[in-house]
Amino acid sequence: MLDNMIHEFKKKKVDYLSNIKDPLNIKDEFYYPDGFDIEIFSKKSLLSSYKKISSSFDYEHVTTFIRSSNIFKKHFVKSQKKFQKLKLSVDTKKDLNNVKKIFKVFASNIFFSFEDIFKNKKSLDIIKKQLIR
């Protein structure tokens, strides 16, 4: 997924590209689950943001400023499916244990993909059972 996003970033020639939900399109339900967030931005946009931001929040979370500003060229990559209720980030010990279970499902194929996780019934059951927001 990351390779595809980098390719899109270069192809689109944007300042910022992401697969997270577009803040200007809040009704959109086609975005990736937590844990698969990718944000790519140019050095130029980062330096420009640094000069323009004034809040400590924006210093800490610079992409929030880039996403909400009209001065940058942005592109949001949508998913083909609705994943908004699924969470696959590792924020707690329980999350880590659940991700370990998913890795065990794919023990014979260490090169599994994002799509493989959501096509496989066992891994999808783990996610749905324990990682629903």
Where are the regions a protein language model picked out?
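Conserved core of the sugar-phosphate nucleotidyltransferase
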Residues: M1-L86, K94-N97, K101, F118-R133
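A C-terminal functional module that forms or caps the active site or interfaces directly
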Residues: V90
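AAA+ ATPase "lid" subdomain C-terminal helix
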Residues: F106-A107
